């Protein structure tokens, strides 16, 4: 066993293709981030954040932001549904 063989054992196979492995990125995350920037989602997020501030500022309230959360998720997921499968391999 020579020095080159030991180096391959310590660093891997020595194959540059294996050393240049790309980190996999979930396409769902990428598409969601893109969709969240669209006007409809931005407005829904603003309503959700406004509701959250309002509810958080009160010590006792029965109000919650469920409706605003579902509106935001619906808007985002509607956008995602149309774009996600185009980006899959």
UniProtKB/Swiss-Prot annotation:
This is Cytochrome b-c1 complex subunit 6, mitochondrial. It is a peripheral membrane protein. GO terms for cellular component: mitochondrial inner membrane; mitochondrion; respiratory chain complex III. The keyword Electron transport applies. Disulfide bonds join 35-79, 51-65. Its main location: mitochondrion. The modification N6-acetyllysine is found at residues 40, 83. Component of the ubiquinol-cytochrome c oxidoreductase (cytochrome b-c1 complex, complex III, CIII), a multisubunit enzyme composed of 11 subunits. The complex is composed of 3 respiratory subunits cytochrome b, cytochrome c1 and Rieske protein UQCRFS1, 2 core protein subunits UQCRC1/QCR1 and UQCRC2/QCR2, and 6 low-molecular weight protein subunits UQCRH/QCR6, UQCRB/QCR7, UQCRQ/QCR8, UQCR10/QCR9, UQCR11/QCR10 and subunit 9, the cleavage product of Rieske protein UQCRFS1. The lineage of its organism: Eukaryota, Metazoa, Chordata, Craniata, Vertebrata. It is found in: Mitochondrion inner membrane. Residues 1-13 form a transit peptide. One of its GO terms (biological process) is mitochondrial electron transport, ubiquinol to cytochrome c. Component of the ubiquinol-cytochrome c oxidoreductase, a multisubunit transmembrane complex that is part of the mitochondrial electron transport chain which drives oxidative phosphorylation. It comes from the Eukaryota. Keywords: Acetylation, Disulfide bond, Electron transport, Membrane, Mitochondrion, Mitochondrion inner membrane, Respiratory chain, Transit peptide, Transport. Residues 1-27 are annotated as: Disordered.
